[in-house]
Regions:
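Hydrophobic residues within beta-strands of alpha/beta enzymes
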Residues: 63, 132, 171-172, 213, ...
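Proline-centered loop/turn at the N-terminus of a beta-strand
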Residues: 90, 170, 212-214, 253
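Helix-rich catalytic cores of soluble enzyme domains
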Residues: 117-203
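Residues that line or immediately flank small-molecule/substrate-binding pockets and catalytic motifs
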Residues: 67, 136, 217
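Catalytic core of soluble alpha/beta enzymes
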Residues: 179, 183-250
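Alpha/beta catalytic barrel-like cores
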Residues: 1-127, 140, 149, 228, ...
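Conserved, mostly hydrophobic/aromatic
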Residues: 39, 134, 173, 215, ...
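Short, histidine-centered active-site or binding-site loop motifs used for metal coordination
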Residues: 97, 138, 177, 219-221
């Protein structure tokens, strides 16, 4: 498959991307929250449980991995990328080195990881990865994000995307405007518009083939501490409006990040977006916590009961798969408990 075919497959209707690329530090926090020791064995066991689930075939188009996981071997002797491929999904890799303080800014962040990326991409391709991910983060305050932050991160995302395509892989472009703060939904709309528009300007300058990319943006949401809450209908309307205004038509689709949304909110909001989608874009998900949280809690209580954990994960994956086609509803959600 060439990169355009892979990108289309990644955003296919009925499926979405499992973000299992948490760094060791992030996994430590997640496992600690459920009273499980964070060691290589436990990290692998939990992830392997998800990657072997039945829903991988019909609901998961791709899996984003952390460097450690890409190099691991499953209990059946297959490498993790081989296990994912056997499950009917595409293996991918997170390639950024995290967000650091942007010099000359008011504590804003710039993502690092461009040094040596060309060589790393060659190795990741040999290890079986066929797409990559790079995340840029922007926080909203009275002054931020600054022009410096927006431009610096867009430039880094574009350089990354060009290097990934050079290695015959699909870049996921992830500009995340964080939910933290008391900003309104309109403020989120304005900032996200500026951020996405700048990203596509830089991608054009760097001659990136947009048909071989996937956008992973935030939904348009009010800040976590905003007093004015928004309905799923309003979130969907503003999100669609923002993307129609700023996304070039060549991009095959969008895989939304879940940000700080709960599992149900992330599913419901995606469903609403697809209900009113009047574009040629496919709107799907690239969720981490919003796909894994319930499964993680179940696994922590009964690590040996793999089928039980997989059942919980399969339900979440099916619900999100349904929401990519606007087929999710409360009754379907409750069917799992029945």
């Amino acid at each position: 498959m060439n990169i355009e075919e892979i990108a289309k497959k990644m955003v296919a209707k009925g499926k979405g991307i499992l973000a299992a690329d948490e760094s060791t530090g992030t996994m430590e926090k997640r496992l600690k929250s459920v009273n499980v020791e964070c060691n290589e064995k436990n990290r692998l066991q939990f992830r392997e449980t998800l990657f072997s689930s039945a829903s991988m075939k019909n609901c998961i188009s791709g899996v984003i991995l952390f460097d450690e996981t890409l190099r691991q071997t499953a209990s059946n002797g297959l490498s993790i990328p081989e296990l994912i491929k056997k499950s009917g999904s595409i293996p991918g890799i997170k390639v950024d080195k995290g967000a650091k303080i942007l010099s000359g800014s008011d504590k804003e962040k710039i993502t690092e990881g461009l040094d040596g990326l060309r060589e790393r991409m060659e190795e990741y391709y040999k290890l079986g990865a066929r797409f990559a991910k790079w995340r840029a983060v922007y926080s909203i305050s009275s002054k931020n994000p600054s022009e410096q932050c927006i431009k610096s991160n867009a430039h880094a995302l574009a350089r990354y995307a060009a290097l990934v395509q050079e290695a015959k892989m699909v870049p996921i472009v992830e500009p995340e405007v964080l939910m933290d703060g008391d900003h309104t939904i309109d403020k989120c709309y304005d900032v996200t518009s500026r951020v996405i528009a700048e990203c596509y300007e830089e991608l054009a300058i760097h001659n990136v083939n947009l048909k071989g990319t996937v956008l992973k943006p935030n939904m348009i949401l009010p800040g976590t501490n905003c007093k004015q809450k928004s309905s799923a209908e309003e979130i969907a309307k503003k999100t669609l409006e923002c993307l129609k205004k700023n996304m070039p038509s060549e991009v095959p689709g969008v895989a939304f990040l879940s940000g700080g949304q709960s599992e149900i909110e992330a599913t419901k909001n995606l469903n609403e977006i697809n209900k009113i989608n009047d574009t040629s874009f496919n709107f799907t998900f690239s969720y981490g916590r919003a796909l894994q949280q319930s499964a993680l809690k179940t696994w922590a209580k009964s690590m040996s009961e793999i089928t039980k954990v997989q059942k919980v994960f399969d339900h979440r994956a099916k619900m999100n798969g349904a929401s990519t086609e606007a087929k999710w509803n409360e009754k379907l959600e409750q069917s799992f408990a029945a």
